[in-house]
Amino acid sequence: MANANGKAATSLPEKISAKANPEADDATEIAGNIVYHAKYSPHFSPLKFGPEQALYATAESLRDRLIQLWNETYVHFNKVDPKQTYYLSMEYLQGRALTNAIGNLNLQGPYADALRTLGYELEEIAEQEKDAALGNGGLGRLASCFLDSMATLNLPAWGYGLRYRHGLFKQIITKKGQEEIPEDWLEKFSPWEIVRHDVVFPVRFFGKVQVNPDGSRKWVDGDVVQALAYDVPIPGYGTKNTISLRLWEAKARAEDLDLFQFNEGEYELAAQLHSRAQQICTVLYPGDATENGKLLRLKQQFFLCSASLQDIISRFHERSTTEGSRKWSEFPSKVAVQMNDTHPTLAIPELMRLLMDDNGLGWDEAWDVTSKTVAYTNHTVLPEALEKWSQSLMWKLLPRHMEIIEEIDKRFVQTIRDTRVDLEDKISSLSILDNNPQKPVVRMANLCVVSSHTVNGVAQLHSDILKAELFADYVSIWPNKFQNKTNGITPRRWLRFCSPELSDIITKWLKTDKWITDLDLLTGLRQFADNEELQSEWASAKTANKKRLAQYIERVTGVSIDPTSLFDIQVKRIHEYKRQLMNILGVVYRFKKLKEMKPEERKKTVPRTVMIGGKAFATYTNAKRIVKLVNDVGDVVNSDPEVNEYLKVVFVPNYNVTVAEMLIPGSELSQHISTAGMEASGTSNMKFALNGCLIIGTLDGANVEIREEVGEENFFLFGATADQVPRLRKEREDGLFKPDPRFEEAKQFVKSGVFGSYDYGPLLDSLEGNTGFGRGDYFLVGYDFPSYMDAQAKVDEAYKDRKGWLKMSILSTAGSGKFSSDRTIAQYAKEIWNIEACPVP
């Protein structure tokens, strides 16, 4: 990077004086604040001011502002003492914070100008920031969108999570396929987090239950680690309100180091508690194939719940306006705890334990408080994702909590027997404890449903399936407990900041930028969908985004792609139910047909660039085989001189929020092709639709509602419906399935070895046969393949009509208003949490 004199900007300009000013909002003052941090926040040698130093100094100048706003918000919440929501999630997928904070504070211009005076462009400095590795997929990104909306809507709410040092993993692609290496986002430090040395809570593991003479019970002995709080400020858009994502780190105490053993040379033994504490926040979702892996995952979940609840209770007392401590009966009127999936389920027995054992409440009072405080969001109908923990493991790690869970279960079962004789034969499936002697487990979803005041699904279809199938008997007991809250995304990060050209066009045609916080205003674009001037501007914004994406793809993968081709993208966690395998088999068939065509025929086809990205869990063999297949197909297709003008295939490595912010604005077709009934909602479909990308998809998750909103004619639909899936699986078992010739042709082409010597037999075998483990095409790739290929042919035809395609694209954006996380969170606030806005004056 060169400064105005054409020299590399490696030192600070002497003419700008260093001055700390958290309230700086013009370019000169901001530049002074950046220089101040470069000089006096001594993370680096003072002799340099390279791009990395510029990032940290810029971030810290912003952090000053955020801390001031955070303090004002905290003081205001303490003064008003509103009911507050606490959002518990094992994952947050924040993405880069710099551009988001600058955008939410509306300081893009001043910061860009300030950095120019220091010899840098804002975009270049933003590129230096690493994504916080606190999540993996949609669950974590949803939590982050929700925090943005909570702050923007001025709601009294906080997030709680864990400070993972190495995240899930960083994905690298080699000749072997996907390989995993640790994330390094904290290798230096994060400029956004504020360590709170005064916020430390003890968290116990193992031990035993001590029965006191008065009959009360106490959990004692075992290991005790310290939970230390790190706060990440979350600014709202266009408001002073700045809330907190509080992340916990596990530490051992100084006295837990055995100096005698250490001085005897027994270093590992002397520091074993320090080592065990450090393991808790090392990675997200440690492998759980071993007993130790399961134990570590359970430790993570309990650590999050215990530290967060102790903090929540501390704040409940801190805000007391009366003399002495508050009445516990007030707790549910001041505290709402939302469990994001089943990972934080241990909040239920832990809150019971804290109330009874530490604060002397009786069972009935503690249960009344707990069951009025906690609510549960279900995110899946996949059996493997409905957590079940071994009872023996739970007794070992959390003996007091198992006693409490047993008592909850006993009382629930007794209530059923007393009030619902008709459900007697369902008790074994309704109960929290599955006491099967072969494998006794605790069913966490059942514990959530029994104990929560509200249970919600995350899309209308998903919620309907929960009520009709998964939780049907519970619905007959508590019909009013179940709700739907269709997921949403923040329009700030997913349109305003990631596609500024398109946002400016929207603002120009709507004659207001209020759509950024009131996304329903996008419907105003419908009246202009046929307007040639808008279509021309829309196309130029799309082209700019496609060119930017093409440059990124070449830089990261070395593959040169044509920005005039149709950009077809599928990015999400690699899983068989999400059916990336169907996508790549469709590509294989397209490649084979292109190879068979004469050159004149090829010229009549629609050139297409297919991009696939996402991480496969390290132990999920078939998912990793799919990643390998995509890369092998890409290697062959992209180097084929006859075809590569008309088809390119790219695997985009290490998919994360920042990569998504590059891919989504440049997309034209996006694939959301899960087996119907298996995707709870999905949120990437909303991000693509908001950016004017057309969707090819099944009637699954939020696709159903997106299609309703954007118009059936603007959605490429295919595939079986959720209610047909069980019958189709049964027919497959009975040998009644007849595969489409195109499907067989694609599979045989892969088996022929044209894409290399790797043995794809085990992967393709999952699509063969009628029954058996890992066989029988459980996800209906074969059944849906012909309608998928027909829908892809319709895509090609539609893309040839440029005006028609642009109209569909505009209508896609115009129909995306419903899918703002502001709408979702406003519904949670009103219908589940019963909280109100608390704006900082």
From Swiss-Prot:
The keyword Nuclease does not apply. It holds the Pfam family Phosphorylase. One of its GO terms (molecular function) is glycogen phosphorylase activity. One of its GO terms (biological process) is response to water deprivation. Its EC number is 2.4.1.1. SUPFAM superfamilies: UDP-Glycosyltransferase/glycogen phosphorylase. Keywords: Allosteric enzyme, Carbohydrate metabolism, Cytoplasm, Glycosyltransferase, Pyridoxal phosphate, Transferase. Its cofactor is pyridoxal 5'-phosphate. It is found in: Cytoplasm. It catalyses: [(1->4)-alpha-D-glucosyl](n) + phosphate = [(1->4)-alpha-D-glucosyl](n-1) + alpha-D-glucose 1-phosphate. Residues 1-24 are annotated as: Disordered. The modification N6-(pyridoxal phosphate)lysine is found at K687. One of its GO terms (cellular component) is cytosol. Belongs to the glycogen phosphorylase family. Phosphorylase is an important allosteric enzyme in carbohydrate metabolism. Enzymes from different sources differ in their regulatory mechanisms and in their natural substrates. However, all known phosphorylases share catalytic and structural properties. NCBIfam families: P_ylase (TIGR02093). This is Alpha-glucan phosphorylase 2, cytosolic. It comes from Arabidopsis thaliana (Mouse-ear cress).
